[in-house]
Amino acid sequence: MQQLQNVIETAFERRADITPANVDTVTREAVKQVISLLDSGALRVAEKIDGQWVTHQWLKKAVLLSFRINDNQVIDGAESRYFDKAPMKFADYDEARFQKEGFRVVPPAAVRQGAFIARNTVLMPSYVNIGAYVDEGTMVDTWATVGSCAQIGKNVHLSGGVGIGGVLEPLQANPTIIEDNCFIGARSEVVEGVIVEEGSVISMGVYLGQSTKIYDRETGEVHYGRVPAGSVVVSGNLPSKDGKYSLYCAVIVKKVDAKTRGKVGINELLRTID
């Protein structure tokens, strides 16, 4: 694996000079191997090690290199034809392979090759970009998008129209992460490497970026780039120091543990926020 990483790191340093016409065989095969390993879930761009999320930057570099070394090509789909550098994940799947891998894909959901989809996942008409990791039991609902290299945990619900930001455009240092057992409400956006920690509930229409204030109304604490585990979050505003205006923020209205979440439905958690 170290040799593979070395090839990617070296090629990335000279990426500006690499084209589909001049890329060497070693680099092409290394990138192809990494994309295949990401696609199968054997490797992932970020993983939790000793309680901390670690981003493997060289894997992200391999994803970026894949766009340098591949030409656009015609891609046939059921509803249309496409013209892109990255092939579709399910292009060669037959019924036996879908049955073996154990997830559902509802048309016209689209997944790029290099994204991992775990068992018991349901993809409604949605989009999952290259390098993303979607873990077991997760629902990606209609018109939700999972950005490049985003990490989605087990038993997550991404509601209709949710946007989970990627790392490629604009280039971000770390992927956006939704940990296990989270609920992300309809039309919410989580971007710029924000981490939503385990068991959190994000209400409809909440926007979270690195500069978004995440205000805990019980403690008065303000978080940036991280929603603490077990938080129930809604949209809100905080007043300016002079009181002349207010700016958007996200508000943590309560904290819940796994036991409470198991007994109380998501809708009930969001309705009882006074």
Curated annotation (Swiss-Prot):
Cellular localization per UniProt: Cytoplasm
Enzyme Commission number, as recorded: 2.3.1.117
Reaction catalyzed: (S)-2,3,4,5-tetrahydrodipicolinate + succinyl-CoA + H2O = (S)-2-succinylamino-6-oxoheptanedioate + CoA
Protein family (similarity comment): Belongs to the transferase hexapeptide repeat family.
Assembly notes: Homotrimer.
Keyword Transferase: yes
Species name: Salmonella typhi
GO molecular function: 2,3,4,5-tetrahydropyridine-2,6-dicarboxylate N-succinyltransferase activity; nucleotidyltransferase activity
Keyword Methyltransferase in annotation: no
Alphabetized PROSITE patterns for the sequence: HEXAPEP_TRANSFERASES
Protein name, entry field: 2,3,4,5-tetrahydropyridine-2,6-dicarboxylate N-succinyltransferase
Keywords, ordered alphabetically: Acyltransferase, Amino-acid biosynthesis, Cytoplasm, Diaminopimelate biosynthesis, Lysine biosynthesis, Repeat, Transferase
Binding residue positions for substrate: 104, 141
Main subcellular localisation: cytoplasm
Gene name, Swiss-Prot/TrEMBL: dapD
GO CC list: cytoplasm
Pathway stated in the Swiss-Prot or TrEMBL entry: Amino-acid biosynthesis; L-lysine biosynthesis via DAP pathway; LL-2,6-diaminopimelate from (S)-tetrahydrodipicolinate (succinylase route): step 1/3
